[in-house]
From Swiss-Prot:
Protein's gene: rpmA
Superkingdom: Bacteria
Family assignment from sequence similarity: Belongs to the bacterial ribosomal protein bL27 family.
Classification via Pfam families: Ribosomal_L27
Residue ranges of the region described as Disordered: 18-39
Xref: InterPro entries: Ribosomal_bL27, Ribosomal_bL27_CS
Protein name from the UniProt record: Large ribosomal subunit protein bL27
Single GO MF annotation: structural constituent of ribosome
PROSITE patterns per UniProt: RIBOSOMAL_L27 (PS00831)
Species name: Ureaplasma urealyticum serovar 10 (strain ATCC 33699 / Western)
A GO BP annotation: translation
UniProt keyword 4Fe-4S present: no
Disulfide bonds, paired cysteine numbers: none
């Protein structure tokens, strides 16, 4: 038998059976977006009021906005949500009156 013929006629079989793999089965971590303080609740300076992607709710009086659009209180007071320009909403912090 020709040695060259024997090498070209070699057939290899799988040592492990091929198993289908699913392309599903993963999910992103929760981002915990939304209101952290409701209308009428008291807040401290620096406390997060609303976490959002984009401007769903706009900052009003005494409210700052972070680079990820998070709204936070600049001063201590009471949270107040109001509508403006028809369908838009803004949140403000009204300072507490000091009773002396």
């Amino acid at each position: 038998m020709n040695k060259l013929y024997w090498l070209t006629d070699l057939q290899l079989f799988a040592s492990k059976k091929g198993v289908d793999s699913s392309k599903n089965g993963r999910d992103s971590n929760p981002k915990y977006l939304g209101a952290k303080l409701g209308d009428g609740q008291s807040t401290k300076a620096g406390q997060i009021i609303y976490r959002q992607r984009g401007n769903k709710i706009y900052p009003g009086l005494n409210v700052g906005q972070g680079k990820d659009h998070t709204l936070f209180a600049k001063t201590a007071g009471v949270v107040k949500y109001t509508k403006f320009m028809g369908d838009k909403t803004k949140v403000s912090v009204l300072p507490k009156e000091d009773n002396k």
